[in-house]
Amino acid sequence: MPAGATSVRGDLADPDTLPPALEGVEAIVHLAALFRTEDEDAIWRANRDGTRNLIAAAEAHAPAARFVMASTGNVYDDDQVRPSREGDRCTPTAAYPASKLVAEESLRGSGLNWSILRLPFVYGDGDGHLAMIPRMAPRFGLHPAHTYSVAHHRDVMTAVEIALSGAMDGRIVNIADDRPVTVYEMAELAGDPLEGSAEPLTDPWSGRMDPSLAHQLGFRPTVPTIYDAAREGIL
């Protein structure tokens, strides 16, 4: 733990455990989420109900706190005609993005001072996300040439720090680095290359996000591309 920090254990599913973590705080950063499971009910309980519990506790015990919530770029519809912008249509059907979108709506409808960061594919520091790509691509039919917006862990922190400054108050903001990357490239970087394909892409803009608003608000990635991360040894 950093010097001066105090750890308080809580459970988003148990509202009674939340007040001790919130009393007197000036800011709340909500990064908790559940998605690596086939239990859709558990996803909804964690992401929708858990967020609502945290919002209610914040309204009661830290109503003046700045509330920064991590969401996902997966909320956008797949059939975009360009990289997704914050005002674009969002009608997700899968449990994870749908539950995150409802959580966003709950926060936006609260009386709190909020900001929402829609994150792309996040990787870095050996978190295992890149290593999953060679296995997940065939399972989910990901085209090797499909490109995704990405961001390193460091730049999630960069975005959170900017949000905590107040620059993103009352906004939903896409976060992404400077260069989208293909599934093929991610598998190569993971050390387990995929077969290529000349089949046409469907929904080629799915997974791509436009970070222009973030740039206007002061965000610049400290890890500009996934290849910079590879050179630094921080994949």
Language-model features: locations:
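NAD(P)H-binding glycine-rich loop region in Rossmannoid oxidoreductase-like domains
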Residues: 9-49, 75
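Glycine-rich NAD(P)-binding loop of the Rossmann-fold in SDR/ketoreductase-type enzymes
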Residues: 13, 42-53, 90, 94, ...
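Conserved Rossmann-fold NAD(P)-dependent oxidoreductase catalytic core, especially the SDR/UDP-sugar
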Residues: 52-95
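Active-site Tyr-X1-5-Lys
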Residues: 78, 91-115
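NAD(P)-dependent short-chain dehydrogenase/reductase
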Residues: 108-153
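Mid/C-terminal beta-alpha module of Rossmann-like enzyme folds, strongest
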Residues: 159-206, 210-211
